From Swiss-Prot:
Residues 82-105, 414-433 are annotated as: Disordered. Residues 82-92 have a biased composition (Polar residues). SMART domains: WD40. HAMAP family: lis1 (MF_03141). The keyword Protein biosynthesis does not apply. InterPro entries: Dynein_regulator_LIS1, G-protein_beta_WD-40_rep, LIS1_N, PAC1-like_LisH-like_dom, WD40/YVTN_repeat-like_dom_sf, WD40_repeat_CS, WD40_repeat_dom_sf, WD40_rpt. It comes from Gibberella zeae (strain ATCC MYA-4620 / CBS 123657 / FGSC 9075 / NRRL 31084 / PH-1). This is Nuclear distribution protein PAC1. The gene is PAC1. Self-associates. Interacts with NDL1 and dynein. It is found in: Cytoplasm, Cytoskeleton; Cytoplasm, Cytoskeleton, Spindle pole. One of its GO terms (biological process) is cell division.
Length: 460
């Protein structure tokens, strides 16, 4: 013992052991040890025993805590090493946007909401971001500077979803609510409410502007899709306020909708545990595919961008990926079964991503197509590498202090846009982005909203 402990440390240990034995009614053992060590009664009185009787237990629990911390740190080190190994030699977290992934701490923690945040949406051009909450308010922020710009009021119940888009040259903000309405706001006119769209018979869960360019759609750029607890998807003309199509097929609450990049297809998910793909370019849309596999309500859905086709084709066992000009080739969904599922254009589940410990609430593909990001009620952001068979290569722990309800990636910056190109109504991407990626500059900024009432910005 003398080889590892000093004389004073050894004496402290001996006294602690004697006091522990005495405190646990092992007096004979305590007396024997005291005798062996030559400690008389005067050297180990009642006051000394009281001082040392809990010291051994405290030391023991401290060791256990330290062991746990060491194990946690080793796990974090392993995760970081995995990230490092998966990076290309020339990639740089700060220099290569195609490999950038969010990391803590956030750039900004935006706080002003008084109730849980349900949704967030980036302006396609300016550094504005909107967030909606349970107390019927929408807040507009400058995500670049982390400042609140204004509070927008008009709904009478919880704001459930938000999206920027609309006719070319006239960006609008759409919001939907538990008050059964959709409202359109004009960012160019101090976010005045320019139109209210009634028609749904229950809470409106999701809204998405449909990108321009849908074949056979004379109102391209003017269309908005909505999903509701009334078990319908509706398509609206935002210039007139009329519902131009009502889509039925789900058997329960529809939670989310997502349009394809060309505006021809619409993806929907809900409480009936199905994922449905609709061709909305025809007068009477019918489900082209019904995908079944989730074991609980399906919370979110999104189409994969063409940049992800090569990785997803490999997962699907396809040697040649689909052409970048095609759409609705691959999709991703997340649900309350804690899983993310990747689907091909024939309705086959090509991969199930497991890792979250609670409901999956939001999904977004990395603009490079290599990664898929997800958020969950387990308070984490997870990054899945599609080039490594969907392996989780990064987990941003403690991203929020409560459930994470929403996730968005900032729209790209369009450079040297040529004549004839149009911006995507949702994120400002051009129709030709798939064939001319050099014109698109990735913005390494994501936003998350949470039940903890904060909006957080993660950026490079």
């Amino acid at each position: 013992m003398s080889r590892t402990l000093t004389s004073r440390q050894a004496e402290e240990l001996h006294k602690s052991i004697i006091a522990y034995l005495a405190a646990n009614n092992l007096q004979d053992s305590a007396n024997a040890m005291r005798t062996e060590l030559g400690l008389g009664e005067d050297a180990f009185d009642t006051a000394t025993a009281k001082k040392y009787e809990t010291l051994l237990e405290k030391k023991w629990t401290s060791v256990v805590r330290l062991q746990k911390k060491i194990m946690d740190l080793e796990a974090q080190t392993q995760t970081l090493q995995t990230e490092l190994n998966s990076a290309t030699p020339t990639s740089n977290r700060r220099g290569d946007p195609s490999s950038w992934l969010p990391a803590g701490p956030p750039r900004h923690v935006l706080q002003s909401h008084r109730t849980p945040i349900n949704c967030v949406a980036f302006h396609p051009i300016f550094s504005s971001i909107a967030s909606g909450d349970e107390d019927a308010t929408i807040k507009i922020w400058d995500w670049e500077f982390g400042e609140l710009e204004r509070t927008v009021k008009g709904h009478t119940k919880a704001v459930l979803d938000l999206d920027y888009g609309g006719p070319k040259g006239h960006t609008l903000l759409a919001s939907c609510s538990s008050d059964l309405t959709i409202k359109l706001w004009d960012p160019a006119n101090e976010y005045q409410n320019i139109r209210t769209l009634p028609g749904h018979d229950h809470s409106v869960s999701a809204v998405r502007f449909i990108p321009s360019g849908a074949p056979g759609a004379p109102l391209s750029g003017n269309l908005l899709a909505s999903a509701s607890r009334d078990v319908t998807v509706r398509i609206w003309d935002v210039t007139t306020g009329y519902c131009v199509k009502t889509i039925r097929g789900h058997a329960d609450w529809i939670r989310d909708v997502s349009p394809s990049l060309d505006g021809k297809y619409l993806l929907s998910t809900g409480n009936d545990r199905t994922v449905r793909l609709w061709d909305i370019s025809v007068p009477n849309p019918e489900a082209k595919l019904v995908m079944i596999g989730h074991e609980h309500f399906v919370e979110c859905c999104t189409f994969a961008p063409p940049a992800a086709y090569s990785h997803l084709a490999t997962l699907a066992g396809v040697k040649k990926p689909p052409p970048a000009s095609s759409t609705a080739e691959f999709m991703a969904t997340g649900g309350r079964d804690k899983t993310i599922r990747l689907w091909d254009g024939r309705g086959n589940c090509i991969k199930t991503l497991i890792g979250h410990d609670n409901w999956v609430r939001g999904l977004v593909f990395h603009p490079s197509g290599k990664f898929l990001l997800s958020v969950s009620d387990d308070k984490t952001i997870r990054c899945w590498d599609l080039s490594q068979e969907g392996k989780c290569v990064k987990t941003v722990e403690g991203s929020h202090e409560h459930f994470i309800t929403s996730l968005r990636w900032a729209p790209p910056i369009i450079k040297d846009k040529g004549p004839g190109e149009e911006t995507n109504g949702d994120v400002g991407t051009p129709k030709k982005a798939a064939t001319a990626p050099q014109d698109v500059q990735i913005r390494c900024v994501i936003a998350t909203g949470s039940v903890d009432m904060s909006l957080r910005i993660f950026s490079r």
